[in-house]
Amino acid sequence: MYTDWLIDKLRCPGNLTSLKLIGHSFESDGKLYNVKNDILSIVYPDDIDGDDAKYNRFYNLFAPLYDLNERVMGKLLTGVDMIKGRKQIISLLGLNPDMRILEVSPGPGVFQKGLRTEIGENGEFVALDLSMGMLRQCQKRNGSLNVQLIHGNALFLPFADDSFDALFHFGGVNLFNDPQKAISEFIRVVRKDGIVSWGDEGFSENYRDERRKKILLKINPGFGKPHPLIPDSVCNIKEYDVYEGLGYLIVARKK
C-alpha cells in the first residue's frame, strides 16, 4: 500500500496530528480516512467550495479525455510540442537520485515517468490531487512507476513539516481558491534547503503571437492571471519561461 516512511509522514490535514493505521484506513481523533483501490482519500475540508469545487467536478469528468484532447487540440491551439516542453521543465528542477518528492496536482500523470527517471527506482515518489478521476488516470498510465497516490487538497497538505526533499507542481496554481496558501503549504512540507517548484500557464514578456494570445485568453483566462507572489521563505530563486513562452516555472530552495 504505502511505504513505512510515508505512513510516518502522513498527518491529519486539519490539525497536522499524527494518524494511526487501522487495517486499510487511517484514524485521527475518531475520524477515519479510507484507502480504496490503493488511494488514500484524505480531503480537507469536507465541503470543498469555490473554484476548487468547480474545477474538481470538471477534471473528474474530463480526466478520461485528457490525452485525446492534448493530442488533437494541444499542438493546434498552442503551437507547442508539449512532450518536449515537459522534458525541459523536468530538466530545470535539479532533482537527484534517491530523493523523496511530492508532486501536487499531477493530473493524469504526464510528468511522472520523467520525474521517476530523475529520482531513480529507490526514490520515494508521492503524488496528491483533489481529482479522484485524475488519480485513476495516473494509475492507468503509470502503474509500474511505484507512485504513491493521495486524494487530498493542495491547500491542506496531509504531511508533516519538512517531509520531502523536493516538491513539484505545474498547471494548477491559477485554479486554486488561494494560490498563496497553496504555495505556503508547498514550502512547509519540504525540508530546509529542499527544492520547491511551481508553475502554470502565462505569457512571457517576449511572447509576440498576438493572434494566438487572444485566442488562448478567450479559451483560458488563466493565461492572463498575475503570477502568485514568491514568499520570503525561499531563496536561490530561478524563474524560467517554458512551453515556448506560454508558461512559467519557479524553482527555489527553502530557507
Language-model-detected regions and their locations in the chain:
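Conserved class I S-adenosyl-L-methionine
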Residues: 8, 37, 43-94, 110, 195-220, ...
